[in-house]
Design a protein with these regions (language model features):
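A structural "domain/chain start" motif
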Residues: 3-65, 120-121, 153-175
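Hydrophobic beta-strand residues in large extracellular and virion-surface proteins
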Residues: 27-29, 58, 82-84, 107-109, ...
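Short secondary-structure boundary motifs at beta->alpha junctions and helix caps
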Residues: 39-46, 114-158
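Short, low-complexity, polar/charged sequence segments that are solvent-exposed and flexible
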Residues: 46-52, 101-106, 140
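Surface-exposed short loop/turn segments
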Residues: 65, 70-116, 122, 126-131
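Short, charged low-complexity intrinsically disordered segments located at boundaries
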Residues: 83-92, 137, 170-175
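Short alpha-helical interface elements
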Residues: 109-111, 132-134, 165, 169, ...
Length: 175
């Protein structure tokens, strides 16, 4: 019995000490995830700090595998960088009954300037009734952080990836 307890404790400590991402060194990201452009999100979305929370949650959940870069422009940094941009965001704007809230990010992983992976992730809340504009986006940021960490374990290249892909029409038609 004692061996099982010792082994269990050792397993947990090993798991906590091991980074949650599959990279040789720490992956550098921006301390605040930027919006792709000025058209992304409404004034309500831009009042929230969910993009800083998204970065912080990715760093926290990576267990040392992801760190905040010393500069916001990652393109000139050596090593492994993950550029993430918010390409879509929606939150409450018409009172408590404003439908689902969502966020979409696109990300590109580079090792010494060479693209080694890229991906797009979208999360949607299922709670149409909320009095908070920022609360649902915080929950979406938490879910997106988990998605980023899961993808970093096995990054892949999407041949159809484009930063400026116009998903507005396709998503609006699906809603």
């Amino acid at each position: 019995m004692r061996k099982r307890v010792v082994w269990g404790v050792w397993s947990v400590l090993t798991m906590l000490a091991t980074p949650a991402v599959a990279a040789d060194g720490p992956v550098q990201i921006a301390s605040t995830i930027p919006y792709l452009n000025e058209q992304v999100g409404s004034a309500n979305v831009r009042q929230c700090d969910w993009n800083a929370r998204l970065s912080a949650m990715i760093i926290e959940r990576s267990r040392g595998g992801v760190v905040a870069a010393a500069q916001e422009d990652l393109s000139s940094l050596p090593g492994t960088t993950l550029t993430i941009k918010i390409t879509r965001a929606h939150t409450a704007g018409g009172g408590s009954v404003s439908g689902p809230k969502w966020g979409r990010i696109r990300m590109e992983l580079r090792e010494d300037g060479v693209v080694t992976g890229n991906h797009s992730v979208r999360r949607v809340s299922n709670r149409p009734f909320t009095l908070s504009a920022c609360g649902p986006l915080d929950k979406i940021a938490d879910a997106l952080a988990d998605d980023v960490i899961a993808w970093l374990r096995k990054p892949a290249i999407d041949p159809n990836f484009a930063w400026d892909a116009d998903l507005e029409t396709a998503e609006s038609a699906a809603d």
